[in-house]
Amino acid sequence: MTTPSVVAFTKKGERLVGEAARRQAVTNPDRTISSVKRHMGTEWSVRIDGTDYKAQTISAMVLMQLKEDAEKFLGEPVTEAVITVPVYFNNIQRQATKDAGRIAGLNVKRIINEPTSAAMSYGLNHGEPQKVMVYDLGGDDFDERISQWLVRRFKEETGADLSRDFGAMQRVKDAAEQAKKELSASESAHITLPYLTQHRGEMLHMDLTLTRGQLQELIGDLIERTARPVRGALSDAGIAPAELGRVLLVGGSTRIPAVQEKERLLTEKEPSRNINPDECVAKGAAILGSTLEGNSLVAAGTGKSLLLLDMTPLSLSIETVGGVATRLIERNTTLPTRYSRVFTTAVPYQRSVDIHVLQGERPMARDNKTIGRFRLKGIKAAPAGVPQIEVSFDIDANGILKVSARDLDTGKQQSITITSNDSMS
């Protein structure tokens, strides 16, 4: 059983989470929030009844519901959690996720990348040494393409523009998601939405059929776009497709035949069929949670213990002279990790240095994401090039970054732990 990440506020002041919130979205679209994950670590907020809710708070409401459901099932309190995040989440988004857990009353023991969690779920049952690729694909963009097609076809047939009807659009989006699922197993999906909208005094109904071939035309370019990250992952790992032992498909959209065919062409491997793409990420997180409680993790059939080593998804750097992003930690570095490097001054007799912390792969600072800034004051006045400033990056197992700067001559030191609040102040 899964819980949709949807939160709704009824006009009576009641808060609904999960399937209950999703069911009433048609009649209450302005007070229903979904897909909040993409707003984590940003300034985004939504105002309901005079109260502003940030993404962390909405996410915490979902976590509270999961906590409550788990406690009912287990019959005991749940106080700790392992939370999975998309691999592309930056440091700010990870800290915001941890903040959401704290708001929900949970001690977040670890933040783990979703593909890593999926691989862990698979590895527990397959002890042989091998290289595994995780092909993790969400479905929101696919749903949007189907929704647009339905709106367009409906307008062609009736003249009514559904995009201006919030209630109708919610029903269309739900139908689009269901059609996508049906087309993973069937050649066509019949979309019937009675009493969808009124147009010129007439009640209109939707009755359309979408074929698998039409779906492939709608989403073909999106599937093609997965080629670049797949090839990039192989290149970063320094391996050829022939060296892969398995390819794991994660996310419900990987059930789409065209997606699986693209994966075969890119990796020259049949996808592994013995994991549930909807559940494997959560299972891996549960396994990690068990190990954090002191339980050993043994691969099936081998008796050998497994060790989980996650990686940082993006390079970390500071801005240096000329606006250059000077890297201290490369992407795909195993966590936890620490790295220090000594820098010097560019201006004679300057008494402070600004540390501008960046995340990304571009050579110039302006083209990367700023995740923090701080100033080290009180350095010894000396000609340019004489002071020795040691900058250290320390990333814990959750991917949370601490940056420090120390004048090796005076001992003056300043540090910052990058949090969502730091990034937005």
Where are these regions (language model features)?
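Glycine/charge-rich, flexible interdomain linkers and switch-proximal surface loops
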Residues: 119, 164, 168-171, 190-195, ...
